[in-house]
């Protein structure tokens, strides 16, 4: 019996380590995603109806902002590479980022040694060569490799006559050669992998409302374990392709939406009714069901969280207030999110965001959206559903949401 227990323990430890590693990767993806609001604002200011010919008529100013925003949206792979390397490595510093950049630059240039189609020089219009483009996935992989190798070798000491290359100076050199290997690998095998991702995207799109619902439900379901960024990265930065006005091919629902693809926004629109209306209503329901002596304090807190969710789309403070103490409410929330995604898809609503599905992004990207006005009535309906269902479940099952904790827990928190 002890042997079985001893065998099970290491297996459990290995599984736990893998899970924690995946969580860490998911958290590291948040750093590069944080630059998107800046990109979105600059691209918006560069549109014709703001600083351009249909707005203030400052064409040069519009071009400056448009190019500035395009520099960020067009460089997402290397931004993900740097962000993941810094976010994943323990005690990362500038040498971690340098190693990631060196590896990525080599990797991306090596890809050009494997053209999918050759360049054609002809009278009238030359056709440029096309290359395999793993996009942000390649950047993430290079960032992870840089973080792991930096962690392993940044204190490595070589023989005396190579002492100049000890430690942090060694890792960028290693990453240069790793970039060659990864570039050759993707150059040889990316085409079927890319086709598989494209086919998966077409399959998800082909499911119609069901595909949007599946994504929305999985997105919310993975938040408690911190792994939702994996599915977000695939859907928002990898699926689909669109050629923008500059002739560059961009990938992913967010990037395509910001580039003006009218078919994009299907994996984002359904979050607006939830984040702007549904969750704020849930917060109000929790405040109204708090014990009378705690209702005022909880109401003040929940109004603040609801305003944050509505304006910015930051929902974690509300979600974590009931996620673990009342899991049934979180399951309900995930299901309602899936339904919202399905409804917006079914009604032909296309909307997107730079950061999250709050009012700022809703207003900022109105001009790029299709039927954005429908989000308001849909959201009001979901607000009513969230309030009624949350209030009913909290009272019916005596759920210990904020303000309903046992008295002794409140006293302990006060003493702490």
From Swiss-Prot:
Transmembrane segments: 68-88, 96-116, 130-150, 170-190, 196-216, 266-286, 298-318, 323-343, 344-364, 375-395
Intracellular or extracellular location(s): Cell membrane
Gene null: resulting phenotype: Mutant is unable to grow on GlcNAc, while growth on glucose, fructose, xylose, mannose, sucrose or galactose is not impaired. Mutant is insensitive to GlcNAc.
Sorted UniProt keywords: Cell membrane, Membrane, Phosphotransferase system, Sugar transport, Transmembrane, Transmembrane helix, Transport
Assigned GO CC terms: plasma membrane
UniProt note: domains: The EIIC domain type-1 forms the PTS system translocation channel and contains the specific substrate-binding site.
Protein name as catalogued: PTS system N-acetylglucosamine-specific EIIC component
Species this protein is from: Streptomyces coelicolor (strain ATCC BAA-471 / A3(2) / M145)
Gene responsible for this protein: nagE2
